[in-house]
Amino acid sequence: MGQKIHPHGLRLGITSDWKSHWYADKSYADYVAEDIKIREFLSKGLDRAGIADVVIERTRDRVRVDIHTARPGIVIGRRGAEADRIRRELEKLTGKQVALNILEVKNVDANAKLVAQSIAEQLTNRVAFRRAMRKAIQSAMRQPQVKGIKVVCSGRLGGAEMSRTERYHEGRVPLHTLRAEIDYGTYEAHTTFGRIGVKVWIYKGDVVGGRRESEINAPAERRGRGDRNARPRRGGQRRQRAEQKQEG
Protein backbone atom coordinates (compact mmCIF):
# COMPACT_ATOMS: atom_id res chain seq x y z
CA MET A 1 0.00 0.00 0.00
CA GLY A 2 2.83 2.41 0.81
CA GLN A 3 4.21 1.90 -2.69
CA LYS A 4 1.00 3.16 -4.36
CA ILE A 5 -0.57 5.76 -2.09
CA HIS A 6 0.53 9.40 -1.95
CA PRO A 7 3.13 9.66 0.88
CA HIS A 8 1.78 13.02 2.02
CA GLY A 9 -1.85 11.87 2.27
CA LEU A 10 -0.89 8.66 4.09
CA ARG A 11 0.96 10.60 6.82
CA LEU A 12 -1.46 13.50 7.35
CA GLY A 13 -1.57 14.34 11.04
CA ILE A 14 1.43 12.08 11.76
CA THR A 15 4.49 13.59 10.08
CA SER A 16 2.90 15.94 7.51
CA ASP A 17 0.46 18.84 7.81
CA TRP A 18 -2.46 19.97 5.65
CA LYS A 19 -1.75 22.35 2.76
CA SER A 20 -5.03 24.22 3.34
CA HIS A 21 -6.03 25.61 6.76
CA TRP A 22 -9.70 26.58 6.95
CA TYR A 23 -13.11 25.32 8.03
CA ALA A 24 -16.34 25.54 6.04
CA ASP A 25 -19.80 24.06 6.39
CA LYS A 26 -21.93 24.66 3.28
CA SER A 27 -19.26 26.19 1.02
CA TYR A 28 -16.71 23.40 1.50
CA ALA A 29 -16.77 22.25 -2.15
CA ASP A 30 -16.46 25.84 -3.41
CA TYR A 31 -13.38 26.43 -1.25
CA VAL A 32 -11.73 23.21 -2.44
CA ALA A 33 -12.30 24.17 -6.09
CA GLU A 34 -11.00 27.66 -5.36
CA ASP A 35 -7.82 26.27 -3.77
CA ILE A 36 -7.20 24.13 -6.85
CA LYS A 37 -7.60 27.18 -9.12
CA ILE A 38 -5.17 29.20 -6.96
CA ARG A 39 -2.51 26.49 -7.13
CA GLU A 40 -2.98 26.01 -10.88
CA PHE A 41 -2.69 29.76 -11.47
CA LEU A 42 0.55 29.98 -9.48
CA SER A 43 2.13 26.85 -10.98
CA LYS A 44 1.40 27.95 -14.58
CA GLY A 45 2.17 31.64 -14.16
CA LEU A 46 5.33 31.13 -12.10
CA ASP A 47 6.78 27.99 -13.66
CA ARG A 48 10.30 29.48 -13.67
CA ALA A 49 10.18 30.57 -10.02
CA GLY A 50 10.72 27.07 -8.61
CA ILE A 51 7.60 26.91 -6.44
CA ALA A 52 7.96 24.11 -3.89
CA ASP A 53 4.72 24.51 -1.95
CA VAL A 54 1.60 26.69 -1.64
CA VAL A 55 -0.17 26.88 1.73
CA ILE A 56 -3.62 28.53 1.87
CA GLU A 57 -5.25 29.83 5.05
CA ARG A 58 -8.73 31.36 5.15
CA THR A 59 -10.71 33.53 7.53
CA ARG A 60 -14.20 34.96 7.06
CA ASP A 61 -13.19 37.85 4.78
CA ARG A 62 -9.52 37.23 4.04
CA VAL A 63 -7.31 34.67 2.27
CA ARG A 64 -3.65 34.20 3.13
CA VAL A 65 -1.39 32.51 0.58
CA ASP A 66 2.14 31.37 1.53
CA ILE A 67 4.36 30.69 -1.49
CA HIS A 68 7.51 28.65 -0.80
CA THR A 69 9.87 29.30 -3.69
CA ALA A 70 13.51 28.74 -4.57
CA ARG A 71 13.71 32.05 -6.51
CA PRO A 72 11.82 34.70 -4.54
CA GLY A 73 13.17 37.50 -6.75
CA ILE A 74 11.11 36.24 -9.70
CA VAL A 75 7.92 36.16 -7.60
CA ILE A 76 8.51 39.60 -6.07
CA GLY A 77 9.64 41.30 -9.27
CA ARG A 78 11.18 44.75 -9.61
CA ARG A 79 10.11 46.86 -6.62
CA GLY A 80 7.39 44.33 -5.83
CA ALA A 81 5.52 44.83 -9.12
CA GLU A 82 5.10 41.11 -9.82
CA ALA A 83 3.90 40.38 -6.27
CA ASP A 84 1.29 43.16 -6.57
CA ARG A 85 0.09 41.75 -9.89
CA ILE A 86 -0.25 38.24 -8.41
CA ARG A 87 -2.15 39.64 -5.43
CA ARG A 88 -4.61 41.49 -7.69
CA GLU A 89 -5.21 38.38 -9.80
CA LEU A 90 -5.85 36.27 -6.69
CA GLU A 91 -8.27 38.87 -5.33
CA LYS A 92 -10.22 38.71 -8.61
CA LEU A 93 -10.24 34.92 -8.38
CA THR A 94 -11.39 34.71 -4.75
CA GLY A 95 -13.40 37.92 -4.40
CA LYS A 96 -11.71 38.58 -1.04
CA GLN A 97 -8.72 40.43 0.32
CA VAL A 98 -5.53 38.39 -0.22
CA ALA A 99 -2.40 38.50 1.94
CA LEU A 100 0.58 37.18 -0.01
CA ASN A 101 3.64 35.82 1.82
CA ILE A 102 6.73 34.82 -0.17
CA LEU A 103 9.09 32.43 1.64
CA GLU A 104 12.47 31.29 0.34
CA VAL A 105 13.41 27.59 0.22
CA LYS A 106 17.05 27.57 1.28
CA ASN A 107 17.93 23.90 0.73
CA VAL A 108 16.84 23.22 -2.84
CA ASP A 109 18.58 19.83 -3.17
CA ALA A 110 16.58 18.39 -0.24
CA ASN A 111 13.13 19.38 -1.60
CA ALA A 112 11.45 16.65 -3.67
CA LYS A 113 9.34 19.01 -5.80
CA LEU A 114 12.32 21.17 -6.74
CA VAL A 115 14.50 18.13 -7.47
CA ALA A 116 11.78 16.75 -9.79
CA GLN A 117 11.47 20.13 -11.51
CA SER A 118 15.26 20.31 -11.99
CA ILE A 119 15.32 16.86 -13.63
CA ALA A 120 12.36 17.77 -15.87
CA GLU A 121 14.03 21.00 -17.02
CA GLN A 122 17.18 19.08 -17.93
CA LEU A 123 15.12 16.54 -19.91
CA THR A 124 13.44 19.41 -21.76
CA ASN A 125 16.91 20.73 -22.66
CA ARG A 126 17.80 17.29 -24.10
CA VAL A 127 20.15 16.19 -21.32
CA ALA A 128 20.50 12.39 -21.05
CA PHE A 129 17.93 11.14 -18.52
CA ARG A 130 20.38 8.85 -16.69
CA ARG A 131 22.84 11.68 -16.24
CA ALA A 132 20.13 14.03 -14.94
CA MET A 133 18.80 11.43 -12.48
CA ARG A 134 22.22 10.47 -11.11
CA LYS A 135 23.29 14.09 -10.74
CA ALA A 136 20.13 14.89 -8.76
CA ILE A 137 20.65 11.85 -6.51
CA GLN A 138 24.27 12.76 -5.80
CA SER A 139 23.37 16.37 -4.97
CA ALA A 140 20.57 15.27 -2.63
CA MET A 141 22.66 12.68 -0.78
CA ARG A 142 25.26 15.34 0.05
CA GLN A 143 22.68 17.07 2.28
CA PRO A 144 22.97 16.03 5.96
CA GLN A 145 19.21 15.64 6.51
CA VAL A 146 18.68 13.34 3.49
CA LYS A 147 18.84 9.63 4.39
CA GLY A 148 17.66 8.23 1.05
CA ILE A 149 16.17 9.18 -2.31
CA LYS A 150 14.26 7.44 -5.09
CA VAL A 151 13.73 8.89 -8.59
CA VAL A 152 11.40 7.51 -11.28
CA CYS A 153 11.17 8.76 -14.88
CA SER A 154 8.46 7.44 -17.21
CA GLY A 155 7.80 8.15 -20.89
CA ARG A 156 9.61 8.04 -24.23
CA LEU A 157 13.05 8.24 -22.64
CA GLY A 158 15.81 9.12 -25.06
CA GLY A 159 13.29 9.45 -27.90
CA ALA A 160 12.50 5.72 -27.94
CA GLU A 161 9.41 4.59 -29.86
CA MET A 162 8.07 2.63 -26.89
CA SER A 163 7.66 4.32 -23.52
CA ARG A 164 9.27 2.77 -20.44
CA THR A 165 10.05 3.49 -16.80
CA GLU A 166 13.51 3.94 -15.29
CA ARG A 167 14.16 3.90 -11.53
CA TYR A 168 17.20 4.87 -9.49
CA HIS A 169 17.53 5.02 -5.72
CA GLU A 170 20.16 5.43 -3.05
CA GLY A 171 19.90 4.97 0.70
CA ARG A 172 16.70 4.00 2.55
CA VAL A 173 13.20 5.11 1.52
CA PRO A 174 10.75 3.31 3.88
CA LEU A 175 7.37 4.09 2.29
CA HIS A 176 5.42 1.79 4.65
CA THR A 177 6.74 3.39 7.86
CA LEU A 178 4.23 6.01 9.02
CA ARG A 179 6.68 7.82 11.31
CA ALA A 180 9.13 8.27 8.41
CA GLU A 181 9.35 11.81 7.04
CA ILE A 182 8.94 11.31 3.29
CA ASP A 183 9.00 14.31 0.95
CA TYR A 184 7.31 13.60 -2.39
CA GLY A 185 7.20 15.68 -5.55
CA THR A 186 6.25 15.30 -9.22
CA TYR A 187 6.82 17.29 -12.40
CA GLU A 188 6.30 16.87 -16.15
CA ALA A 189 8.92 17.47 -18.83
CA HIS A 190 7.55 18.60 -22.21
CA THR A 191 9.86 17.26 -24.92
CA THR A 192 9.59 16.93 -28.71
CA PHE A 193 8.77 13.23 -28.23
CA GLY A 194 5.99 13.85 -25.70
CA ARG A 195 5.63 14.24 -21.96
CA ILE A 196 7.98 12.57 -19.48
CA GLY A 197 6.80 12.21 -15.89
CA VAL A 198 9.29 12.62 -13.03
CA LYS A 199 8.61 11.43 -9.47
CA VAL A 200 10.93 11.93 -6.49
CA TRP A 201 10.78 10.50 -2.96
CA ILE A 202 13.21 11.85 -0.31
CA TYR A 203 13.56 10.25 3.14
CA LYS A 204 14.67 12.67 5.88
CA GLY A 205 14.59 10.42 8.94
CA ASP A 206 11.89 9.48 11.46
CA VAL A 207 9.65 11.77 13.51
CA VAL A 208 9.70 10.66 17.17
CA GLY A 209 7.46 12.37 19.71
CA GLY A 210 6.70 15.23 17.34
CA ARG A 211 10.41 15.95 16.80
CA ARG A 212 12.30 15.25 13.60
CA GLU A 213 15.40 13.08 13.64
CA SER A 214 17.53 15.95 12.32
CA GLU A 215 16.44 18.15 15.26
CA ILE A 216 17.22 15.39 17.79
CA ASN A 217 20.69 14.69 16.38
CA ALA A 218 21.61 18.37 16.01
CA PRO A 219 22.88 18.90 19.63
CA ALA A 220 25.06 15.77 19.41
CA GLU A 221 26.55 16.93 16.10
CA ARG A 222 27.33 20.38 17.46
CA ARG A 223 29.36 18.93 20.34
CA GLY A 224 32.64 18.33 18.56
CA ARG A 225 36.33 18.77 19.22
CA GLY A 226 36.13 22.53 19.61
CA ASP A 227 33.24 22.47 22.12
CA ARG A 228 34.30 23.63 25.58
CA ASN A 229 31.38 21.83 27.25
CA ALA A 230 32.44 18.47 25.82
CA ARG A 231 33.59 15.95 28.44
CA PRO A 232 37.33 15.10 28.32
CA ARG A 233 38.36 11.60 27.38
CA ARG A 234 39.34 9.15 30.11
CA GLY A 235 42.62 8.41 28.39
CA GLY A 236 43.63 12.06 28.63
CA GLN A 237 42.95 12.16 32.40
CA ARG A 238 45.03 9.03 33.00
CA ARG A 239 47.89 10.46 30.97
CA GLN A 240 47.85 13.67 33.02
CA ARG A 241 47.93 11.72 36.30
CA ALA A 242 50.86 9.61 35.11
CA GLU A 243 52.80 12.73 34.09
CA GLN A 244 52.14 14.35 37.49
CA LYS A 245 53.44 11.23 39.32
CA GLN A 246 56.62 11.22 37.23
CA GLU A 247 57.23 14.91 37.96
CA GLY A 248 56.66 14.30 41.69
From Swiss-Prot:
Task: Give one GO molecular function term.
Answer: mRNA binding
Q: Which UniProt keywords apply?
A: Ribonucleoprotein, Ribosomal protein, RNA-binding, rRNA-binding
Q: Where is this region: Disordered?
A: 214-248
Q: Which PROSITE patterns match?
A: KH_TYPE_2 (PS50823), RIBOSOMAL_S3 (PS00548)
Q: Name one GO cellular component term.
A: cytosolic small ribosomal subunit
Tell me, what is an example of a GO biological process annotation in this record?
A: translation
Which Pfam families does the entry mention? KH_2, Ribosomal_S3_C
- Comp. bias regions, Basic and acidic residues: 214-230
Task performed by this protein: Binds the lower part of the 30S subunit head. Binds mRNA in the 70S ribosome, positioning it for translation.
Concerning PANTHER family, the annotation shows:
30S/40S RIBOSOMAL PROTEIN S3, SMALL RIBOSOMAL SUBUNIT PROTEIN US3C
Q: Which family does it belong to?
A: Belongs to the universal ribosomal protein uS3 family.
Q: How does it assemble?
A: Part of the 30S ribosomal subunit. Forms a tight complex with proteins S10 and S14.
Give the protein's recorded name.
Answer: Small ribosomal subunit protein uS3
**What is the organism of origin for this protein?**
Corynebacterium glutamicum (strain ATCC 13032 / DSM 20300 / JCM 1318 / BCRC 11384 / CCUG 27702 / LMG 3730 / NBRC 12168 / NCIMB 10025 / NRRL B-2784 / 534)
